[in-house]
Amino acid sequence: MRKSLCCLLLVTSFLGCGLSVNALERPTASQYDARVMYTDYKPGQVYPIRAANGLITTITFSPGEKIRDFGSGYSTAWEFQARGNNFFLKPKDFDGATNLVIVTDKHTYLFDVHPGSRAKATYSLTFRSVSY
């Protein structure tokens, strides 16, 4: 019985470790409004964006960082526009969940974008100035 319990705990701990590998790291919400988010760039990190019909989400990169290119898996479901170090997106299709890749002159950013409710929408995601 004791040996079985130890094996079960060992297997469970290994399974738990595997589950966290693909976990999204959530950006930090503003102390004033949870729809305004801040984060640091981390290579290989996927950043979640929750957008809402009729609302624009702004992604702001470090000052001086220039957007070179972008693409998504379901681009017809979204409106995209890049200006300076800002990137704007707005859903056109309520079922338009996809990934988004934005390449700047400094980094490649990976996003998981989903349309959803206004209450959970990301109005703004700002990347703080951090060098890697």
Predicted ranges, named:
Residues 21-132:
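A general "mature secreted/periplasmic domain" signal
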Residues 8-17:
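Bacterial N-terminal signal peptides
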Residues 1-8:
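Bacterial N-terminal signal peptides that target proteins for export
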